[in-house]
Amino acid sequence: MLVKLDTLVARYDELNRLKTQRALGLMSRYGQQVFQLLPVMLHFNHPLLPGYVAGDVPHGIWSFTANEAQQAFIQDLCQNANCQNGLTTHDKSIQGLYSMGSTSSIGQCCHSDLDIWVCHVAGLSQERLELLDLKCQQLSKWAEQRGVDLNFFLIPEDKFRQRNDAQMQGESCGSAQHLLLLDEFYRSAMLIAGKRLLWYLVPAEYDDRYDEYVNGLFAHGKLSQDDWLDLGGFDRIPAEEYFGSALWQLYKGIDSPYKAVLKSVLMEAYSHEYPNTRLLSVTSRDWFQHNEGMHYRLDNYCLMLDKVTNYLKSIGDMQRLDLVRRCFYLKVCDGLSHPKEDHSPAWRREQMTQLVAYWGWSPERLHHLDHRQEWKVEDVKVAHAELLEALMQSYRNLIQFARRNNISESINPEDIGILSRKLYAAFESLPGKVQRINLTIAPDLSEPDLSLVQVPHGRLNRAGWYLYKHSLEPADIIGRAPLEYNGYISKLVSWAYFNGLLTPQSRVHLFNQGSDLHIDNLHQFCRDLSGTFPVKYPRATNLALSRPCEIRQLSIFLNLETDPTSHWVGQVIEFDANAADVFSFGRNLECLVGSVDLVYRNSWSEIRTLHFQGDEAVVDALTTILGKMHQDAAAPEMIEVFCYSQHFRSLVRTRFQQLVAECIELRLARDKQQLVKTLALGKEKYGIFFERRGVSVKKLENAIDFYRHISHNKLDHLPLRLDKTHSQHLPGIVDSYASEGLVQFFFDTRDAGTNIYILDEANRVEIYQHFAGNKDELVQGVNRFYTSSHERFSDAGQFSNFNLPPYYEIVQVNGELEVIPYRSQGPLRDGAGQARELGSATG
């Protein structure tokens, strides 16, 4: 036993040395510097060092001794600062530093990020954890200045021996993954400084008695706890984790689609083997315990490829296998058809050459993949559809796996809500929503020429607007397929702009057959759009995603397609200059707003567009804007109004802006019982009625009709459905959260029992009093209903229902009612907040 242990320890150290050598060989010069100095920065907390934070910051890495390069850095630093005593510490809060993910694997390149686990002793206070987190954030900024993407994750040594109640934050997967994350760590971890990882020494036959075996090693003096970190063992992954992991990988697919496809199919392969799943970490450990040196079975990415290849072959899915191979190639390889770069290690190229030869790829396919930097919108649209369908296929299969095995998800309700809404914002295809197609697939989709062609009603093609990436010259456009179609032009221009096709250098052409739009106004609209919205905008925060979405930036474009004033040529227009009403103008009482186009960014970071045309365009646009605002919403950060009228442009713009501001103020007014805004629109009069739970519009034929309507109980159009035995006053704070298009659940446990308030998509409410069941089971049942019974298929056949209901608790704080996100009430739940913990950000 002792001899074998000695052999494994020596093999562990040698393998870690080879991994470190390989990792450094794939890094840039600055990447090498950051990597080698990390232990120094976290071992010491000194004002001379980057990342210094004042206070009782946990630092000090067990058994860390600076190597020659690190010692030279410390000496130079102290000498330059005239620091005579050098750097010292007596703290030993950090058990070890480890990289995970692509580092040292075939998936690493000079641009790969560094994902670092900072494993610390258990029991650190919340205040000290926050200081350590702040120190890590400072070090990430220091690395960013050197062009290195550095992510830290704080891991208490007992993390994987407890129930996972961590919250998602940034790159952290929170409760979405737990033991799956440990599996990924064990198969990819590389020791940077501190204690070795004990799990690699435990034979597979002892996995079911892991703790007993490990305790025996320490008790009999075979190993010292001062040298080895035990994060725990596992002989299987709970099936409950697969659903949360599928959601997490879909989310990661927004930025890293190729890697996400590999990992999603891996989760699918794991579930296919359930309950006798052969984990990749176990495969890697078995090879390590019985063989010497580096091998592809010790490479995280090669292991993944091998596993998913065997799985897809076993189910006969050769189409996805081909996609998986392309994803692997694009994630890993710089391009075999390009000349070898001097700094590129030979082993990566040799291994990829062997794989490509085995796959039987043609030189043409290699050339196409290797020139991804030159891909334009057609290639990107095809790739986007393929990647998204593959991710959705894995997601569907994992849902079916959970249904077959009657499995409840382990991810907590708050995290599942946040993740599902991140996916909803990124992937859900909805009318008017601008879908971003370039998931880091190609660097530049800009086009020198873009043409917008209108087809009127009565033609062979569908009436509306078509976008082409060519000029209107017959030789350029005849026989070409359009890129996109829509019924209104603002959606097409927005799609081209936010996907990077439309730039200030693009030449925009117009072929108009029926609208009042002319080329100068189209060019001005393009400038107005780009001047108002940046192409890239911040990601939605978890806090925003835990609440109903709100309009953040709103641009309103008047008379872009239909301009009533453009038809005044040769007419005498009589009006009172002192009392001109642009909504009921002149002797003919004409509304000078013929069309309204809305482009807005909401708090979930979606870009939405809407188009209104006709006699009621103004009230339709107003009620739509107001319907996007719940009672307690913040007013939009920015509202811009643009007008393209041939006449009275400034007057129309100013008056509409005033009307919008007035209506928003009424919608968000506090303590209102009932407010009404009357509006003359052409020859008609309308009443806009503002209530806590929504806004409604009614055409008013006469004064009697008006007074009848404002005195009528509006519950006829906002019905309140109570339980059959009791009536219940609805807390006002529930009304405040009313937001159309979203089902919301509120749990009220202030009195004996639990009352449940449910707001549906139309802001109707149902109340269930004295609910006696288990809230966690209710939440899981509702989520399962949405993901299973409500499967919807888009035109492309893709599953696309991510807008799961949010769940809230009503609590009383200092005498005031507040709404907080509902979190699982599991037996080991700790109500105290936690410092940022683990992530699954792997390179």
From Swiss-Prot:
GO molecular-function term, one example from the UniProt record = ATP binding
Query: What does its activity-regulation comment describe?
Result: The regulatory domain is involved in the regulation of cyclase activity by the carbon source.
Instruction: Cite the residue spans of the region called Regulatory.
Output: 543-843
Q: Where in the cell is it found?
A: Cytoplasm
Recorded catalytic activity of this chain's protein: ATP = 3',5'-cyclic AMP + diphosphate
Q: What is its EC number?
A: 4.6.1.1
Looking up InterPro entries in the UniProt record yields: Adenylate_cyclase_1, Adenylate_cyclase_1_CS, Adenylate_cyclase_1_N
- Assigned keywords, A-Z: ATP-binding, cAMP biosynthesis, Cytoplasm, Lyase, Nucleotide-binding
Keyword Cytoplasm listed? The answer is: yes
**Gene Ontology cellular component?**
cytoplasm
Where does the record place the region Catalytic?
1-537
Q: Which GO terms describe its biological process?
A: cAMP biosynthetic process
Q: Which NCBIfam families match?
A: PRK09450.1-2 (NF006978)
In the record, the note on similarity to other proteins reads: Belongs to the adenylyl cyclase class-1 family.
Q: What is this protein called?
A: Adenylate cyclase
